[in-house]
């Protein structure tokens, strides 16, 4: 049986209108407006869907791991409702300020604590940072190969075969297992939970760890936000005169040539 670990992050809904967000220039972080809900990171949902597809093809056990300062249970338990077997929540006030390296360190430590694993899946990046560094960081800390940007994953005979997304198509990569794979949105959306799944998850147990349970001291971060701001936008509007549409068009062409925009 394959043991698959899926690392999932809870983020502020990336589909919320950008105008509802504000910037805290002192704390250097984005402040969502009240009422904007937390959701599973869409790319991590893609990785969970990849795990479920593998489980449909062969015997497998899926363990979801999520780390954060305060993880909403109603959101993260969606992973159990759609078919994951186990859920591990790593929660600690010490996670208030974490960068990609610290996050990768926490998750890699948790994976080691879980023990046996064949495949670790993550989203290609988080929707709230777009950094795309945690997956590769976990692989480095675990000392296992990493294959990125998967749109299809097949596992068999001790190897994983991955179709990797490229700008001009895709390429095929193969690796021995254990291996980490980051998953792109081309894998497909996460399936909806069934009524049976939603009911079962209400009684399904899950595990909660903190820093003490992991027996670690958090390392210092390796990146720092220097400035976070909303770029100033200057909009200039000029009315091109013309007594007729033809004249206005001719004047517009002249204007574009004068400003080197045409």
Regions found by a protein language model. Give the residues of each.
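N-terminal glycine-rich FAD/FM-binding segment characteristic of electron-transfer flavoproteins
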Residues: 1-262
């Amino acid at each position: 049986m394959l043991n698959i670990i899926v690392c999932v992050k809870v983020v502020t809904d990336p589909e919320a209108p950008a105008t509802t967000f504000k910037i805290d220039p002192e704390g250097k972080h984005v402040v969502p407006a009240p009422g904007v809900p937390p959701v599973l990171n869409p790319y991590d949902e893609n990785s969970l869907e990849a795990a479920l597809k593998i489980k449909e093809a062969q015997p497998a056990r899926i363990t979801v791991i999520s780390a954060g300062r305060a993880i909403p249970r109603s959101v993260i338990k969606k992973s159990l409702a759609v078919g994951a077997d186990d859920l591990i929540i790593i929660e600690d006030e010490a996670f208030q300020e974490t960068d990609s390296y610290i996050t990768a360190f926490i998750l890699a430590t948790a994976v080691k604590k879980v023990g046996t694993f064949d495949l670790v899946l993550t989203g290609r990046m988080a929707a709230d940072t777009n950094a795309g560094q945690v997956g590769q960081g976990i692989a480095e800390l675990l000392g296992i190969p990493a294959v990125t940007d998967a749109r299809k994953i097949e596992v068999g005979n001790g190897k994983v075969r991955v179709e990797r997304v490229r700008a001009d198509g895709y390429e095929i990569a193969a690796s021995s297992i254990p291996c980490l794979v980051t998953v792109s949105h081309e894998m497909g959306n996460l399936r909806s939970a069934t009524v049976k799944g939603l009911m079962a998850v209400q009684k399904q147990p899950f595990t909660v760890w903190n820093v003490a349970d992991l027996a670690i001291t958090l390392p210092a971060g390796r990146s720092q936000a220097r400035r976070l701001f909303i770029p100033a936008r200057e909009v200039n509007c000029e009315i091109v005169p013309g007594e007729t549409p033809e004249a206005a068009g001719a004047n517009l062409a002249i204007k574009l040539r004068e400003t080197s925009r045409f």
